[in-house]
Amino acid sequence: FTINNVGISGNMRLDDEVIRRELYTRPGELYNQSLLFQTIRTLGSMGHFTAEAIAPDIQPVVNSDELVDINWPLEEIASDQFQIAGGWGGGTFVGSVGVTLNNLSIKNFFKKGAWRPYPMGQNQRLSISAQTNGTYYKAFAISFTDPWMGGRKPNSFTISAHYSDENNAYYAWQKGTRYFRTAGVAAGLGKRLDWPDPYFTFYAEASYERYML
């Protein structure tokens, strides 16, 4: 059989093009059962759909013995994360908060009506976190990842930055006289490999770290 049309339904937050670039079942190609299962695994690993509900609807084309249509009915799930935590360590309370947006769309930042609640659709990830004990320690981190840099090939781009500050003012009424600060940035590129299978990735990163005493 030859694949005639490939349809997608059920995606309200993720753009069609983002899903289609992950499909191994494409119009004009021969129907292949192994590529069908590979597509199911890939869609399930994206983290935006109910993996157990991914089941392609394969229908023969009317008046044809050689063509089939494949429709992918998808069930979206919440993929963003908000984390808040607290604990006791080193004789003090430590709190942390973080938010991760897993379906960001940078290209829609200035698009009218896109902020509902933020521009989404391109499967880009933005993560922001902060940690402090309220007195002598605080840390911040931010990272951004585009899994398909430029939208043409599955080459990922990641950029991140972090900052931490620790001093010897162990109580709120004290003034620190010594400190240890770190700041750093990093940028990395990832390339999806075909061998030994499409789930292997080569990743290279360059980073800069500064220590201040």
Q: Which residues make up each language-model segment?
A:
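Solvent-exposed, non-transmembrane alpha-helical starts
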Residues: T2-G7, K153
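Gram-negative/organellar outer-membrane beta-barrel architecture
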Residues: R13, E29-L213
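N-terminal periplasmic "start-of-domain" segments of outer-membrane beta-barrel proteins
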Residues: R13-P27
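Generic structural signal for individual residues within well-ordered alpha-helical segments
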Residues: G7, R20, F37-I40
